[in-house]
Amino acid sequence: VEETGGRVHRVAVGGGACGEYIPQAIAQGCDTFVTSDLRYNDFLDTRGLNLIDAGHFPTENIVCPTVKAYLEEHFPEVKTVISTSHRDVIQYYL
């Protein structure tokens, strides 16, 4: 939150690689954008916008239960499962 003086007022979220939508986030008045797979130059070229690269898998996988519930409600005859073998290929260390 360095770019906004420690305050966050409006956040845009893009699951997966959504760096191309940075201009739209700014146009919508967002001061923070959470997505993944950002390029080095995205951080250098974007002033006044907090960028958070939260990882590709974590930003997409989180919606799987919601999508599954939607599909089950609208297509009850179709069996839906969430993969247990699909895992994040990146290990994060803090």
Roles of regions detected by a PLM:
Residues V1-L94:
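Active-site catalytic microenvironments in core metabolic enzymes, especially phosphate/sugar-handling
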